[in-house]
Design a protein with these regions (language model features):
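C-terminal motif of bacterial Sec signal peptides marking the signal peptidase cleavage site
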Residues: 17-20
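Detector for C-terminal structural segments
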Residues: 32, 212-216, 292, 316-346, ...
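Short, solvent-exposed loop/beta-turn-alpha elements that line the ligand-binding surface or hinge
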Residues: 38-41, 67-100, 177-203, 207-208, ...
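Alpha-helical secondary-structure segments
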Residues: 48, 122-129, 156-162, 204-205, ...
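Aromatic- and charge-enriched surface segment that lines or borders ligand/interaction sites
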Residues: 94-139, 154, 160-162, 303-305
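Surface-exposed binding/hinge segments that line
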Residues: 108, 143-186, 207-212
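Structural transition elements
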Residues: 206, 333-367, 383-387
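Ligand-site clamp/hinge motif
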Residues: 225-274, 289, 403
């Protein structure tokens, strides 16, 4: 089992970033790694990226899966981005400034950007995107942008976000899908098909040219992208990226070794040592924001509407065994909540159940007075490692006389059931993580939020989470986040968290210019194939 030292400690809070005026010279290549010293980048070439599951939605407004973002980061630019070290940097927004009361954030935009369809990226486009994300029924970005009262166009390159109150996590939200800009012309013309066929809709380094669900997605070089490398040469270098869903991690690694793929961003722990020793492959790893969980349905009428059952499952888990014996062995860290060691608000002393407590779980179930606990766990199909982890959890729960039946379905099917709050017991679904702890917590525990698939509701948690969003002092904000965590993980649990991941990046040796990011999403704009 890994210690916390394997995780990047990110210093500073977004409140500090928001309070400052940011700007200055754009990092070369958007802050991406250049080829190593002595290795000259070369233009051209095509690669295949083995994605762990098929995408569900390529509209940033409606996307709820990690796999979607792997393609989105190549085709869409966002207003700001993050470096591998966790620093927020200018992207489509060249600089920004926040008012003294924290209620107005003014962004100055790049003027050398066009969408792939040739239409202009400007302040009007930003306003349209943010308002679309905020007001469209079914949008999954509403919580990210809840603090934004209105957006004002000052001029073509200046846009002002008027906030209801100071909002510490705003920049962190704008790094990801809430800050991704899409072409109004394309989205309006395509309509319902935009979810999986947003061709020429972004401004990013690659253009989505083909989308065959379940088989492949083709990204072609954007010759007009604004990014440059450290020497001032145009990016990207690659001509084409083919993204293929490969659900089984072992099969994906075989594809990498046989030349049928050149990039992966997941691996079973048992394979790490061999990959590191393979002279034909490169292995990079950094700490992650991601967490693993079991998601109960706490809606009225379902088994876990009595939260004592959720707590019993959490108590019965042997987290050390899962992280030592399961498929994550060697590449994970035990955890009890969603705030990871990579977050400023992490509390290393938070260990409500340092060891599995099956006897305590039995007593809690007996207190409910309805007999033994039995439920169904929905497990994503296609990956033997995931099923192995679920079987290990099943055996651990049996020690507390808890019966857990396993049912496999595709990840997209499970998420659809989960989002409709129709799962009978629990689902085996985690989260890829966000830079600010608000992105790892708020949407999952606040009443009615878009990712609150457990139907959890606790007024005290709602109040604490609202307070931390408005708090500008990082130390005070941390305490509010930790108070809320104690409630939604222990006192009145919303789901069962059991560990954190790492962010691996595995490539063929002659693919250079890539770095591993804590969100586990590959950045391809500076990737280069050495011939």
């Amino acid at each position: 089992m890994r210690s916390a030292r394997y995780f990047v400690a990110f210093l500073g809070a977004f409140a500090v970033l928001l309070a400052a005026c940011s700007g200055g010279q754009q990092p070369a290549g958007g802050g991406s790694a250049s080829p190593s010293a002595g290795t000259k980048a070369t233009y051209g070439g095509s690669i295949t990226f083995g994605l762990e599951n098929d995408v569900s939605n390529l509209d940033p407004m409606l996307s709820g899966l990690f796999v979607d973002r792997n393609i989105m980061y190549a085709m869409y630019d966002s207003l700001v981005r993050v470096t591998p070290k966790g620093d927020i940097i200018p992207w489509l927004a060249d600089k920004w400034e926040t008012s003294s009361d924290g209620k107005t954030v003014t962004f100055t935009l790049r003027t050398d950007v066009k969408y792939h369809d040739g239409t202009a990226f400007d302040a009007d486009s930003v306003k349209w995107n943010i308002e679309r994300y905020k007001t469209t029924q079914g949008s999954l970005r509403t919580a990210d942008l809840a603090s934004v009262d209105s957006v004002t166009v000052v001029d073509a390159k200046t846009v002002k976000f008027n906030l209801k109150s100071a909002f510490a996590p705003l920049l962190g939200a704008l790094v990801d899908r809430a800050g991704m800009m899409v072409s109004k012309a394309v989205q309006t013309a395509v309509g319902a098909d935009f979810t999986l066929k947003p061709f020429k809709a972004g401004t990013g380094p690659f253009i989505l040219a083909e989308a065959v669900k379940g088989d492949h997605y083709t990204l072609e070089k954007n010759p007009n992208w604004w990014g440059k490398d450290k020497d001032g040469s145009k990016l990207p270098y690659l001509d084409k990226i083919t993204v293929r869903p490969i659900t089984d991690a072992d099969v994906a690694l075989t594809n990498l070794r046989t030349g049928n793929a050149q990039v992966l961003n997941r691996i079973n722990g048992k394979d790490v040592a061999a990959v590191k020793a393979d002279s034909t492959l490169s292995y990079l790893e950094v700490g992650s924001f991601s967490w693993n969980s079991l998601v109960p349905n706490e809606a009225p009428g379902f088994i876990f509407s009595d939260h004592r059952y959720v707590k019993a499952v959490a108590m019965a888990l042997d987290r050390d065994e899962i992280l030592q014996s399961g498929p994550a062995a060697g590449i994970g860290l035990v955890g009890w909540g969603p705030i990871s060691p990579a977050h400023f608000a992490y509390d290393a002393s938070f260990k409500p159940w340092p060891k599995a407590d099956p006897d305590g779980a039995k007593k809690l179930i007996a207190d409910v007075g309805k007999g033994p606990l039995k439920f169904e766990l929905l497990v994503p199909s296609g990956d033997a490692g995931i099923l192995q982890a679920a079987q290990l959890i099943k055996s651990e729960l049996a020690k507390a006389d808890i019966t857990m039946d396993l049912k496999t379905q595709t990840l997209n099917e499970i998420v659809a059931i989960q989002q409709k709050h129709q799962h009978l017991g629990m689902t085996f679904v985690g989260w890829s993580g966000r830079l600010d702890p608000d992105g790892n917590t708020y949407d999952f525990v606040v009443t009615g939020s878009p990712n609150n698939d457990s139907s959890y509701s606790n007024k005290q948690v709602d109040d604490l989470m609202a307070q931390q969003r408005a708090e500008s002092d990082p130390a005070k904000r941390k305490q509010l986040l930790l108070q809320a965590q104690q409630i939604y993980t222990v006192d009145d649990p919303s789901r069962v968290w059991y560990g954190f991941g790492v962010s691996p990046l595995i490539t063929v040796k002659n693919l250079v210019g890539m770095e591993s990011y804590p969100d586990r999403i590959p950045r391809f704009q500076a990737a280069s194939l050495q011939k």
